[in-house]
A protein has these predicted regions:
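DNA polymerase sliding clamps and clamp-related checkpoint/processivity subunits
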Residues: 1-41, 45-181, 187-283
Length: 283
């Protein structure tokens, strides 16, 4: 099964190069890709990455099983995307992948590919990365040694939320950073037209009330006015979330009683990542 997207009118394409690969993906959106790797390496040490004709997926939990990351980058959003199999699953050490991706310059074109010789009976031994800079006529190729993928494939649960809030990503980052100085726990509450952030520590307590306003906070979905939605969450874990801040200007926050908090970031124009955090047990 083969599917490809080609938006490379202004990029050089080597058809013989693509013919030698079971997977070829090309993008010029370098900064968001690096930001994504920076965030994921602190949440997922090792993970499966699934490539299918429609795009790239990661669905995995951190080691403590309190954070679930769900990433989908659509094939149509890349400059070039060709996956010649119905599904290719690889196992990756995210810190090692980050070390390779982190050396790329913003002016480079990134090609992610798997050579036919590295794909044997569905098992992939290496993931290749090519950094091309047309200005200085430089091409760097790196090959990451892969690990054995996890046999169990997780699914993202289909859950209904009563409250979905749109909020500037920079504002959410500042709230988490400010309150992390005071406490280890954060209560998030959705009441009427307000979103409330509340915490208490050994030397201080703090409360931030955020109301709807044009161009800032707004409810995408609002719960019944008589319903209060609240949960308590680890600020340390939320500090991992805000490493995604530079991916987009606005985030969506999903809230429901007794369910994980979900924060959705757009990965520039490539797709989105949802980060889910289990609530702390009631004290």
């Amino acid at each position: 099964m083969s599917n490809f997207v080609d938006k490379t009118q202004n990029l050089p394409l080597d058809n013989s190069f693509n013919d030698g690969n079971v997977l070829t993906i090309k993008t010029v959106q370098i900064a968001p890709f690096r930001t994504l790797m920076t965030a994921l390496k602190d949440i997922l040490l090792e993970t499966n990455i699934t490539f299918q004709p429609d795009g790239i997926r990661i669905i995995n939990m951190d080691k403590s099983h309190t954070i679930l990351a769900h990433l989908f980058l659509a094939a149509k959003n890349f400059e070039f995307y060709e996956c010649k199999k119905s599904k290719i699953v690889i196992g990756v050490n995210m810190f090692h992948l980050f070390k390779l991706i982190n050396s790329i310059d913003n002016d480079d074109t990134l090609t992610i590919y798997i050579e036919n010789s590295d794909y044997v009976d569905g098992i992939v031994s290496h993931l290749a990365l090519k950094f091309e800079n047309g200005e200085i006529k430089q091409c760097k190729t790196q090959k990451l040694r892969l690990i054995e993928p996890e046999p169990e494939e997780l699914e993202y649960p289909d859950v209904k939320f009563s409250s979905i809030i749109n909020l500037p990503s920079a504002d959410f980052q500042k709230i988490i950073r400010d309150l992390s100085c005071i406490s280890e726990k954060l209560e998030i509450k959705s009441v009427g037209n307000e979103l409330i952030f509340k915490c208490s520590g050994q030397f201080a307590s703090a409360e931030i009330h955020r109301a709807e306003s044009d161009g800032s906070m707004g409810f995408v979905l609002k719960q019944d006015s008589s319903k209060i939605i609240q949960g308590e969450f680890s600020l340390k874990n939320l500090s991992y979330f805000i490493k995604c801040t530079n991916l987009c200007n606005q985030i969506e926050v999903y809230l429901e009683n007794d369910l994980p908090l979900v924060v959705k970031y757009d990965v520039a124009s490539l797709g989105s990542i949802k980060l889910c955090l289990a609530p702390l047990p009631s004290s």
